[in-house]
Amino acid sequence: MQLNSTEISELIKQRIAQFNVVSEAHNEGTIVSVSDGVIRIHGLAECMQGEMISLPGNRYAIALNLERDSVGAVVMGPYADLAEGMKVKCTGRILEVPVGRGLLGRVVNTLGAPIDGKGPLENDGFSAVEAIAPGVIERQSVDQPVQTGYKSVDAMIPIGRGQRELIIGDRQTGKTALAIDAIINQRDSGIKCVYVAIGQKASTISNVVRKLEEHGALANTIVVVATASESAALQYLAPYAGCAMGEYFRDRGEDALIIYDDLSKQAVAYRQISLLLRRPPGREAFPGDVFYLHSRLLERAARVNAEYVEAFTKGEVKGKTGSLTALPIIETQAGDVSAFVPTNVISITDGQIFLETNLFNAGIRPAVNPGISVSRVGGAAQTKIMKKLSGGIRTALAQYRELAAFSQFASDLDDATRKQLDHGQKVTELLKQKQYAPMSVAQQSLVLFAAERGYLADVELAKIGSFEAALLAYVDRDHAPLMQEINQSGGYNDEIEGKLKGILDSFKATQSW
C-alpha cells in the first residue's frame, strides 16, 4: 500500500497532536558501598529521614543517615546480591504497615506480610510505623484494669488500661509465660492483643502461636515476628510496626494490649545498625539516642479521651475512650538491673514486675519479687474488691520477708512471730500459679479473702494447693451466680463479704481437701 504526500502529512500531524510530553521526575542515586545490610548511596540530594528507598528486585531500604555527600540506609531483607554502582530511587514515602481487624488471628512479619500460610490479609488500610504519641490534653487518666489472671500481679502490682508496665528479669524466669497468660486472659475481655516477637527462634514463636490457638486467644491477637535470622533492620522496626497495628484499635475507641518480647534484642539490633552507620558509640557501645529509641515507642501506649477518638473517627465514634497498654520485656544479665538499657526502660515505664531466678528455682512461680516490683498508676484502676482484699497480702508478705531474714539468726521465737512466719509461708504458697491457668477476678478475690481472714491457719502448708483447687471447684459447682456477679461488678460491700464468709465456712466444714 502506497501513501500519498497528503496522507503522510496528515498522519504526522495526528501523531504530533497525540504526542504526550509528560515527563516523570525522580530522585535517583548510586550505591557506593554495601556492608552487613547497610548501604551508602551517592546522589539522593532530596532524601528524607526515614524515607523508603526503592532497590532493585522489589526491595526497600530506610534512610537513617543523611550526610553531606551520601545517604546511609539499612536494607529491609536480603542484601547479598546488592553491589556498588546499582541505581536506587527515592519513593517519597515513609514506611507503612497494613492495619485493621483483618490482621487479628494472623502471624505477620515486620512489613505486615502474612507468614502463616492462611492467604492474603484483609486490612482496612495502612498506617505509618513512626507516629507522634498523643499529647497531654488528648490523654485520660488510667482508671480501668487489665486483668492478667495472676493473683500476685493483679493483687499487688495492678495494671491499668493505657499503662506501660515493664516485665524484667534474667533469662528463663518466666517473662514470656507471664505475658502470654495475660493475652490468654483477654480472650473474653474485649481487649485486642498484639504480640511482637523480636530476635527469637522461629521454633519458640511457633510454640507461642500454638499455645494461643489452643487456649482460644489467637483469634483476638496479632503476632508480629522478626526472628533471630532476620536482618537487624527488621528487628529494630518490628516494635514500631506492632505499635501501629495496636494504635488502630486505640484511636477508634477500643482497648488494646501490646507485648514487646523483648526490647533488649531491639536495642542490640539498633546498636548494630548504628555502629555500621559509623555513629559515635556511647555507654556499652550503644548510640546516644538509645533512650529515645524506647521512649518514642512506649509513649505511644496511652489512654486517649473521648474527644480525641471522636476527632480521629470524624464523629463516627462518640463517648468512647481508647487505650493501648504496653508490657515491654527486658532481659537482664545476672540480675543486673542497673545496666544501661534496663535503667532506661525502668525510667520510661509506669512500673515494673521483677522476676527473680532464685524464686523461680525455689518453685515460686510466677517468680515475682513483690518487694521491688511496683505499679505507679495501676492502683487507681484496681476493682473495688481486689483493692480491699490485696492490701493485707502485701503487708503480710513484707512482714514475712523481714521476719524470715531475722529468724535465721534467732533460735527461740515467740508465738506471734511464729504465726506471722507461718501465715507468710502460706500466702507465698497460695500465690503460686500454674502456667496457662489464669484466674478470674471472683476466683482471685475468694482466695485472697481466705488468706486475709485467717481461713488458712489450720491448713497444712503442703495442702494449700489442694485446698485452693477444692475451694474453686466447690464455688464453681454451688455458687456460680455469686462468682458471676463479682466478675461483672467488681464491687465489695457487707453483703458480698457475708456471702464469701458463708462460702468459706461451709467449705471448711466439708474437709474435702
UniProtKB/Swiss-Prot annotation:
It catalyses: ATP + H2O + 4 H(+)(in) = ADP + phosphate + 5 H(+)(out). Pfam families: ATP-synt_ab, ATP-synt_ab_C, ATP-synt_ab_N. ATP binds at residues 169-176. Keywords: ATP synthesis, ATP-binding, Cell inner membrane, Cell membrane, CF(1), Hydrogen ion transport, Ion transport, Membrane, Nucleotide-binding, Translocase, Transport. InterPro entries: ATP_synth_asu-like_sf, ATP_synth_asu_C, ATP_synth_asu_C_sf, ATP_synth_F1_a_nt-bd_dom, ATP_synth_F1_asu, ATPase_a/bsu_AS, ATPase_F1/V1/A1_a/bsu_N, ATPase_F1/V1/A1_a/bsu_N_sf. It is an enzyme of class 7 (translocase). It is a peripheral membrane protein. SUPFAM superfamilies: C-terminal domain of alpha and beta subunits of F1 ATP synthase, N-terminal domain of alpha and beta subunits of F1 ATP synthase, P-loop containing nucleoside triphosphate hydrolases. One of its GO terms (cellular component) is proton-transporting ATP synthase complex. It is found in: Cell inner membrane. Its main location: membrane. F-type ATPases have 2 components, CF(1) - the catalytic core - and CF(0) - the membrane proton channel. CF(1) has five subunits: alpha(3), beta(3), gamma(1), delta(1), epsilon(1). CF(0) has three main subunits: a(1), b(2) and c(9-12). The alpha and beta chains form an alternating ring which encloses part of the gamma chain. CF(1) is attached to CF(0) by a central stalk formed by the gamma and epsilon chains, while a peripheral stalk is formed by the delta and b chains. Produces ATP from ADP in the presence of a proton gradient across the membrane. The alpha chain is a regulatory subunit. Belongs to the ATPase alpha/beta chains family. This is ATP synthase subunit alpha. It comes from Klebsiella pneumoniae (strain 342). The lineage of its organism: Bacteria, Pseudomonadati, Pseudomonadota, Gammaproteobacteria, Enterobacterales. The gene is atpA.
